[in-house]
Amino acid sequence: DLYLIAVSDRAVGEVAARLPIPDGAAVAHTAGSVPLAALPERFARRGVFYPMQTFTRGREVDFGEIPVFIEASSPALCDELEAFARRLSRTVIRSDSAQRAKVHLAAVFACNFANRMYALGERIARDAGLDFGVLKPLVTETAAKARDARSPLDVQTGPAVRGDRAVAERHEAMLDGDPRAREIYR
């Protein structure tokens, strides 16, 4: 048997400590930022099964496209987790807790920080009397280019890349009333 603990990162240890899981069962959590050691040692077969994706209730994802990072307390359990993961995903990566913590940080930058920038763009567009919809084709193309490029840096555009200081200064002036947005822009 495999028991997956799919709760918020901060709840993994507490939930695991309270679960009535039979001896000999495998227990794995799905949290990217939580080390394997967060699972109590009373579970002889401990593991991590981290699908690196953002999940939203009611929104379908293609699990085959989602990289799954695995780690286990033994090579045998790692093999079991890998076999399970390969039934769901085309990309399975064996990863220790330190590497997984870094990939989780990278995921936060790539997903959450980018989304925060979309929200800032939405606010600026609304200040100009426009809906976020006007930015959606740009968001889609930017994400597609970043996905398809060797590196996102290869497809960076804008006044900074072009060395167009005059445009950058005008943009910064428009952000005078919002020091935080101005700092992000720089």
Where are these regions (language model features)?
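Rossmann-like NAD(P)(H) cofactor-binding subdomain of soluble oxidoreductases
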Residues: 1-60
